[in-house]
Structure formats: structure tokens, C-alpha cells
């Protein structure tokens, strides 16, 4: 059997949208294939990895059933040379697709924690059979940048595609440019047909629609038509509907007429889980020490964290060395300095003392009272996470003998956090207060 025929037969097993978005551009590589190895080329590395994970076993099974032979399936990114040979028709086909989703943004790859479980639950619930457009509609997810709003939005899109639904994903900028382009070309009917006839409309950063009244008017009518036809609408923003500047009251009212879910900065355990998930996806092996260092040294922007992980791997690969804690510190030093220069240990000490109703002089003393020791350890822990101070510098600040005393306190408070959920929550609360204050 011609292996290319496998994809055609597989097409019958999938929804039209799922096949078009993920497998239609997969090409059989006859030159690299052997009797027991079938190689397929995907448009890029990200798509290759996704198809290998999601469809590799299914393609192998399909091939064995229909040919009677077993084969290993290898999905790889096509080379630049092969890419240049792609026809203009293929490029036009890709551009014509109404949905451009990151295939790795799925519910399975989304790490759930206290900071995002409500938003996750609402989005996941509507992807169950017959729930789209009926259970929660619209869904409005808001929160600071880099916390997973786009991931969640596109997870709904990918799940909807697998259900055979027509999905439109667009940022506000995409929507505005699309409208402006069609207006200039006298093809607004095409614009209306695209957006009004979808099953699922996903709009990222909806706050930027507030640039002109005409854009908002168009979106208002599109919103109403999709909603009236039981289509699902999900939007993301940096603020809740009532705080959106430049957005008309009638749009704010419609945005709020459904589920409003916020995503807040993740707690430490969630950040660690996210880092592990990112490492797993990118096939990067980091020790627990490095993972904990990244989690406690960087802010809460997930894209930023993933960028550091990829940079670490690139450094190690190029230099031909192992990823060590020392390498991590070297790669991250400028980044951490930039983030931490506005936060001082005095700021941390002041806030912790206020929270525990303790004098700063007591925390800096040698007193061994339990509440003072705990407060001291929290200050040290937060100083390690939020400032660029080294252990010797912290030892000097607390007038301790040397940095080993600081290391001991860090170890003790880390153990306490792992065994005491309320303490962990309190420290996360203090950390967020310090970060907010430093940005004001």
C-alpha cells in the first residue's frame, strides 16, 4: 500500500476541520523511508512534534491493518530546501484557513492550579458534547499577560476542531486588520461571512477593540449573530469587562452576560509544575535544583519562563555541556537583575514584620522565639526569590556567621512550605503584594 494513501484513509476517521488543520500538509518522504520506517514531513518542528504525539500510533496502526506490515512512524519538520519547493497553492491554502492555532495548546498540556482552575473548568466544560454555545456563553477570561489565557483559548479551539466545528481564532489586531482590508477592497460580505458563520469565535486581547466606533459596531453585530445561532464565544483581556477603556457600554454588557473568570499569578507549586511540563514538551532535562531556582527567581510570566528554559538548552547544546545550576545562574543573571532591581530586602522585611506584627529589629536579631524565627526565614526566602542578593550578602544583612546559616534557613522554610499549605499560601500572598508594590 502507498503510505500516502494512509493519510487519505485516515481522513475518513477525523472531522474535516481536524484533518485540514493538522494533517492536510503532511507529506510522505519516500527517500528517507524504509520497509520498516515511514517518514513524513510536517511544515514545522512544532507541528511535527504534535502530530508525532497525537497521531503517530494511529498512523502506524492504520498502516499495519491495511498492509499487514509493521513500521515505525517518524514525523519530522521539512528542511528549508524542501520548504522552498512548496507550491504557491499550498501557501495560499494555509493563509486561507480561518483558524491558525498552536497545536500544542491543549487542555492536557495546561497546568491547573488554584490560580486558574475556575477559568480552566469553565472552558473545559463547554467542550463536552452538545455544550458548545449552550452551557456558558460567552466566557470572558482576564488577567495579566503571560499567565496562560491564550493557551486556554486555543485549547478550546483545538478541542472544538476535533468535534468537527468551524473555529475562528483572532487577536483584536487580526480582527481590525481583517475588517480594514476587506473594507478597502469592497469585500465586507466576505468578512461578514467568515466571522458570522463560525461555530466558535475566539478573540484574544479584546480590550484593543476600543480603537474606533466602527470596529466595535461590527463586532457587536457579529457577537449577536453568533450568539443567536448558538455559536460559542470566548474572549480574553487584561481586565474584567467593567474596567475596559474605550469599549461601549452595550459591548461591556454583552461581555459580562456569561462567565467571567480571572487567571492570577500561579503559586510556587503550580509554577514548578508548569516548568516541568514545559521541559517535558521540549525534551529538556533539568534537575530539581534548577527547576526550583527558575521558579523562585523569575516572575510569573509563563512565556518568559519557557524562553529561559529554551535558552538554557540552547546554551548547553552550543557549548556542549550539561545544564547545571551554575549555568542556569549565568544565563539568567541579567534577566533576574532587571526584574529585581526595584525590590529591596528592606521592603520585604517591612511587609513581613507588618504581617506578623513583629519589630524589624527582632527579625534581624538572634532571638529564637518561634514566630520570630519563622518571620526571619520568610524574609530570607522572599529575598532569595525577589532580589539579586547572594547568600553571603544575606548573611551580612542578618549578621550571621556565614552563608551556610542562610542556606540552612532556606532549607527549613522550604520544608515548612511543602508540609503546610496555609503557610505556602501566606508566602505567595506576601510575594504578590511585594511584586505589585514594586511595579506601582
UniProtKB/Swiss-Prot annotation:
Region annotation (Domain IV, binds dsDNA) ranges: 317-440
Segments for region (Domain II): 74-99
GO molecular function terms noted in the UniProt entry: ATP binding; ATP hydrolysis activity; DNA replication origin binding; lipid binding
Span list, region Domain III, AAA+ region: 100-316
Gene Ontology annotations for the cellular component aspect, listed alphabetically: cytoplasm; plasma membrane
Binding site for ATP: 146, 148-150
Gene3D superfamilies: 1.10.1750.10, 1.10.8.60, 3.30.300.180, P-loop containing nucleotide triphosphate hydrolases
SUPFAM superfamilies given in the database record: P-loop containing nucleoside triphosphate hydrolases (SSF52540), TrpR-like (SSF48295)
Subcellular compartments: Cytoplasm
Region annotation (Domain I, interacts with DnaA modulators) ranges: 1-74
Pfam family, one: DnaA_N
Sorted UniProt keywords: ATP-binding, Cytoplasm, DNA replication, DNA-binding, Lipid-binding, Nucleotide-binding
One of the GO BP terms on file: regulation of DNA replication
UniProt cross-references to PROSITE patterns, sorted A to Z: DNAA
The keyword Nucleotide-binding is assigned to this record: yes
Xref: PANTHER family: CHROMOSOMAL REPLICATION INITIATOR PROTEIN DNAA
Free-text domain note: Domain I is involved in oligomerization and binding regulators, domain II is flexibile and of varying length in different bacteria, domain III forms the AAA+ region, while domain IV binds dsDNA.
Assembly description: Oligomerizes as a right-handed, spiral filament on DNA at oriC.
HAMAP family: DnaA_bact
Family, as annotated: Belongs to the DnaA family.
Biological role: Plays an essential role in the initiation and regulation of chromosomal replication. ATP-DnaA binds to the origin of replication (oriC) to initiate formation of the DNA replication initiation complex once per cell cycle. Binds the DnaA box (a 9 base pair repeat at the origin) and separates the double-stranded (ds)DNA. Forms a right-handed helical filament on oriC DNA; dsDNA binds to the exterior of the filament while single-stranded (ss)DNA is stabiized in the filament's interior.
This protein's name: Chromosomal replication initiator protein DnaA
Species this protein is from: Campylobacter jejuni (strain RM1221)
Gene that this polypeptide is encoded by: dnaA
